[in-house]
């Protein structure tokens, strides 16, 4: 009887522990990207497409990861002036309106249901 009571207690403890592990939020188990070393070279802004800041408490260093036009991630020190200038330049590019192609709809004279589309270039304001 003592053996079955002990086994029952162990089983209950195992079930309680496993449900606690399964109830953890997904973010706890999600992978974190960290930079352990930084580039020693200044990267031309012309080669850069985007960036993201890394400031997770799980990472040893705060960093910026630049994505190049060739889809390569490069870790950089956010305290360096060229990194701050590149971030400002990329932010400015994102705010600058670009030329967009839109389509104007012209109704055909024979029927009201059909339409033809002709591309026209416009600039957003």
UniProtKB/Swiss-Prot annotation:
Lineage: Eukaryota, Metazoa, Chordata, Craniata, Vertebrata
Gene3D superfamilies (UniProt xref): 2.40.50.40
Signal peptide: 1-23
Glycosylated sites: 40, 55, 112
Name this protein carries in UniProt: C-C motif chemokine 2
Gene Ontology MF terms in the entry: CCR chemokine receptor binding; chemokine activity
Region Disordered: start-end pairs: 97-125
PROSITE patterns: SMALL_CYTOKINES_CC
GO cellular-component term (any): extracellular space
Keyword Cytoplasm applies: no
Sequence intervals crossing the membrane: none
Highest taxon of source: Eukaryota
Keywords: Chemotaxis, Cytokine, Disulfide bond, Glycoprotein, Inflammatory response, Pyrrolidone carboxylic acid, Secreted, Signal
Compartments it resides in: Secreted
InterPro entries named in the record: Chemokine_b/g/d, Chemokine_CC_CS, Chemokine_IL8-like_dom, Interleukin_8-like_sf
Cystine pairs: 34-59, 35-75
General function of this protein: Acts as a ligand for C-C chemokine receptor CCR2. Signals through binding and activation of CCR2 and induces a strong chemotactic response and mobilization of intracellular calcium ions. Exhibits a chemotactic activity for monocytes and basophils but not neutrophils or eosinophils. Plays an important role in mediating peripheral nerve injury-induced neuropathic pain. Increases NMDA-mediated synaptic transmission in both dopamine D1 and D2 receptor-containing neurons, which may be caused by MAPK/ERK-dependent phosphorylation of GRIN2B/NMDAR2B.
GO BP annotations listed: antimicrobial humoral immune response mediated by antimicrobial peptide; chemokine-mediated signaling pathway; eosinophil chemotaxis; inflammatory response; positive regulation of cell migration; positive regulation of synaptic transmission, glutamatergic; sensory perception of pain
């Amino acid at each position: 009887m003592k053996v079955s009571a002990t086994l029952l207690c162990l089983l209950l403890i195992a079930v309680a522990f496993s449900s606690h592990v399964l109830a953890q939020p997904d973010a706890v188990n999600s992978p974190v990207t960290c930079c352990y070393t930084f580039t020693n070279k200044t990267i031309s802004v012309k080669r850069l497409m985007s960036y993201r800041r890394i400031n997770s408490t799980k990472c040893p260093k705060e960093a910026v990861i630049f994505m190049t036009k060739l889809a390569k991630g490069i870790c950089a020190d956010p305290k360096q002036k060229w990194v701050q200038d590149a971030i400002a330049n990329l932010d400015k590019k994102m705010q600058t309106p670009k030329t967009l192609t839109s389509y104007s709809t012209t109704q055909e004279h024979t029927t009201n249901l059909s339409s033809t589309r002709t591309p026209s270039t416009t600039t957003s304001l």
